[in-house]
């Protein structure tokens, strides 16, 4: 029978397959022999074409499923190794350092007793104290010292906080935060065995002692004051000759001048000016190698008596140097020639020589009045006149005008100007400048008065400035306080012009 099934070509095989499918149908078709169908059902699976095809497909499917399962298992194992195994190994590697405190707490009583004996030993305490005083450059703490400190803290229940420097910085905070084994040094108590002085002594490594800086600043101030006082004194006399209308200045002597030479002495002489005229300059003789020269020389300045109130006496003391520039020792400026007497008779005057590195330049003076109305909140500054201004043009004159700036906390809020006076060093203005300032803001503002020289080409130049206000200095503050003390009343004063300071410097655009 097997030979019958296996014989034939492809057409026979196809016919047999159709016949086999018809025999498997339930119920079988009419006209189909039952015996023939049984013979088809009893054939071996190897000889059935459909059975062979189905077996092959099942085997391929099984192979694919097995391969996919193996791949999934491999992926699962890889993820488990990455996510669980590696972090666990790292944690296990770092566990000995973290397990030290637990192992230290399980020590035997004998080891604790030995450690307590070490703490009672003065030498051991000295070593322990030195180790606890942590340096900013050496943050590592020995393991033995840390263990002994922890055991000592466990034994003593009473804790005494150690005094530390009150001022803290970010450096100290970051230093404590990055310690590998944190230990609160400020809470360590060494017990009653240590003397009180040692227990209360703060850490000395890396400390900043403010008292040293304070002492240094005080010493610096003392040095400056000593330098200002070490310029010595000068003695001179004044007398006015009414017949010849001449002011007679007699330079008598100087005392305790500073040494300017390497040998410890000086070669002093004195220059005399009657300001604002600097063209007329008189000078004493040079006295060699002395710090206490005696001059005893007379100098005559022809000046009318009515002009004496507007003149200033300027004395400059120099050290003569043959091969280089002469060094200035100091200066004396007498603003009021009638300070000592009416000049009808000779009067001797002693003055301290003020330290200076260069001769002061006389920039002139300005006269203005201040008047404040509290009810209206109105401040009126009246520019009256100027005198003896510095010549800024090549012609020997200036074209001055006055600019007044209202300042608040260093910022300029408003500015106003007067008219320009051409070719004069003694202009007269009589012009009022008004600012609206509430009474509650009067202690926050100040006025900066600038005398300017107008230039048709280029920038306008500053001749000099002065300032009045609650934060001003000298006459500027006194004038402001007098205005506030006498409201509704104009208060007029002369103010000397000074050079522009960096804090007052501002742009000067053309008009």
Curated annotation (Swiss-Prot):
Coiled-coil stretches noted in the UniProt entry, renumbered to this chain: none
Disulphide linkage map: none
Biased composition (Low complexity): 94-103
Region (Cysteine motif): 12-38
Tissue: Isoform 1 is expressed in the olfactory bulb. Isoform 2 is expressed in the brain (at protein level).
Region (Necessary for cell membrane association (isoform 2)): 483-511
GO CC annotations, alphabetized: cytoplasmic side of plasma membrane; cytosol; membrane; perinuclear endoplasmic reticulum; plasma membrane; synaptic vesicle membrane
Region (Disordered): 92-119, 157-182
Cofactor comment: Binds 3 Ca(2+) ions per subunit. The ions are bound to the C2 domains.
Gene3D superfamilies, per the entry: C2 domain
CDD domains: C2A_Synaptotagmin-1-5-6-9-10, C2B_Synaptotagmin-3-5-6-9-10
Binding site for Ca(2+) 2: 261, 319, 321, 327
Compartment(s): Cytoplasmic vesicle, Secretory vesicle, Synaptic vesicle membrane
Entry's transmembrane regions: 60-80
GO BP, sorted A to Z: acrosome reaction
Vesicular face of the membrane: 1-59
Cytoplasmic side: 81-511
InterPro entries (UniProt xref): C2_dom, C2_domain_sf, Synaptotagmin
UniProt similarity note: Belongs to the synaptotagmin family.
Domain description: The cysteine motif mediates homo- or heterodimer formation via formation of disulfide bonds.
Complexes and interactors: Isoform 1: Homodimer; disulfide-linked via the cysteine motif. Isoform 1: Can also form heterodimers with SYT3, SYT7, SYT9 and SYT10. Isoform 1: Interacts with STX1A, STX1B and STX2; the interaction is Ca(2+)-dependent. Isoform 2: Is not able to form homodimer and heterodimers.
Protein name: Synaptotagmin-6
Organism: Mus musculus (Mouse)
Taxonomic lineage from the root: Eukaryota, Metazoa, Chordata, Craniata, Vertebrata
């Amino acid at each position: 029978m097997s030979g019958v099934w296996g014989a034939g070509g492809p057409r026979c095989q196809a016919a047999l397959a159709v016949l086999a499918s018809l025999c498997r149908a339930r119920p079988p078709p009419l006209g189909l022999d039952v015996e023939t169908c049984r013979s088809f059902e009893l054939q071996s699976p190897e000889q059935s074409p459909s059975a062979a095809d189905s077996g092959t497909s099942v085997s391929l499917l099984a192979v694919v499923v097995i391969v996919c399962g193996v791949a999934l298992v491999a992926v699962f194992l890889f993820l488990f190794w990455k996510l669980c195994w590696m972090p666990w190994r790292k944690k296990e590697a770092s566990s000995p350092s973290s397990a030290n405190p637990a192992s230290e707490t399980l020590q035997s009583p004998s080891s604790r007793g030995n450690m307590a004996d070490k703490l009672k030993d003065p030498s051991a305490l000295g070593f322990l104290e030195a180790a606890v005083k942590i340096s900013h450059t050496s943050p590592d703490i020995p393991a033995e010292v840390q263990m002994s400190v922890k055991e000592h803290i466990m034994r003593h229940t009473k804790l005494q906080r150690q005094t530390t420097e009150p001022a803290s910085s970010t450096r100290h905070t970051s230093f404590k935060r990055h310690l590998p084994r944190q230990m609160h040094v400020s809470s360590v108590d060494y017990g009653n065995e240590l003397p009180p002085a040692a227990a209360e002594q703060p850490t000395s490594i890396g400390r900043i002692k403010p008292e040293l800086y304070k002492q240094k600043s005080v010493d610096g101030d003392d040095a400056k004051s000593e330098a200002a006082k070490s310029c010595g004194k000068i003695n001179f006399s004044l007398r006015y000759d009414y017949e010849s209308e001449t002011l007679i200045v007699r330079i008598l002597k100087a005392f305790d001048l500073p040494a300017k030479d390497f040998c410890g002495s000086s070669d002093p002489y004195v220059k005399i000016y009657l300001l604002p005229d600097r063209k007329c300059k008189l000078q004493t003789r040079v006295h060699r190698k002395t710090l206490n020269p005696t001059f005893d020389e007379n100098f005559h300045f022809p000046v009318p008596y009515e002009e004496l109130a507007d003149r200033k006496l300027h004395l400059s003391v120099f050290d003569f140097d043959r091969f280089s520039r002469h060094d200035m020792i100091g200066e004396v400026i007498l603003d009021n020639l009638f300070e000592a007497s009416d000049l009808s008779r000779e009067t001797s005057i002693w003055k301290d020589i003020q330290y200076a590195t260069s001769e002061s330049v006389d920039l002139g003076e300005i006269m203005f009045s201040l008047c404040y109305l509290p009810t209206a909140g109105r401040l009126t500054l009246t520019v009256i006149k100027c005198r003896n201004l510095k010549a800024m043009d090549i012609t020997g004159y200036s074209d001055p005008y006055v600019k007044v700036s209202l300042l608040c906390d260093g910022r300029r809020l408003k500015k106003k100007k007067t008219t320009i006076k051409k070719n004069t060093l003694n202009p007269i203005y009589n012009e009022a400048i008004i600012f609206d300032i509430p009474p509650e803001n009067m202690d926050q503002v100040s006025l900066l008065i600038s005398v300017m020289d107008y230039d048709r080409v280029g920038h306008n130049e500053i001749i000099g400035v002065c300032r009045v206000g609650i934060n001003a200095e000298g006459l500027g503050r006194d004038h402001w306080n007098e205005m506030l003390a006498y409201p509704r009343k104009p208060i007029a004063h002369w103010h000397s012009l000074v050079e522009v300071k960096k804090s007052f410097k501002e742009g000067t655009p053309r008009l």
